[in-house]
Design a protein with these regions (language model features):
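… and, occasionally, acidic/histidine-rich disordered N-termini of signaling adaptors
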Residues: 2-168
Length: 168
């Protein structure tokens, strides 16, 4: 029926907006030719996003999972993605960046320690790759870092903190 079509069209339009915030895969491949992206969101729009930005001699990569599914998750992903972009202007240290995002999300969503406060936020793994020093720095909120070294099939896991970004 007409109402169902309007909802579907609206969700498809929201997907185009959400996709526009994702970095182009070709850009990532151009800088990291042996990389790949495994991005399989559950719904047309979702709370999942990946992030990539080259800033000076550093590359920042993130994989994030925001609270909520579908449209509410998509709203959260746009809010969290924007806070990540803003935090990168203030610091290049992954731990500091996550702290800045945490404060920003809590302020934006008016989260307090009260029971009535929303518990929305995100889990994230954030890496900074220093191209000159050939060094990776990582910080994570509930999302660990998985490393597979060249020529190996072994997965090395670096655990994240057991706290999410935002009101948890």
């Amino acid at each position: 029926n007409r109402q169902h079509k309007e909802i579907r069209d609206s969700i498809n339009y929201a997907e185009r907006i959400q996709s526009a915030k994702l970095p182009p895969k070709e850009e990532i491949k151009g800088i990291l030719p042996q990389s790949f992206i495994l991005f399989l969101p559950k719904d047309v729009v979702s709370g999942d996003f990946y992030f990539f930005e080259k800033k000076h001699e550093r590359i920042f990569i993130a994989a994030a999972d925001c609270t909520g599914h579908g449209v509410p998750g998509a709203f959260m992903s746009l809010i969290c993605n924007e806070h990540l972009t803003v935090a990168l202007e203030k610091s290049s240290n992954p731990g500091e960046i996550l702290t800045i995002i945490n404060k920003g999300i809590k302020t934006a969503l008016r989260q307090t320690d009260s029971i009535e406060s929303t518990k929305d936020g995100m889990d994230i793994a954030l890496c900074s790759i220093d191209l000159q020093k050939r060094r990776i720095e990582y910080a994570g909120a509930f999302n660990p870092l998985w490393i597979i070294r060249d020529g190996s099939t072994e997965v090395e896991v670096i655990n994240a903190t057991r706290r999410s970004i935002g009101g948890f």
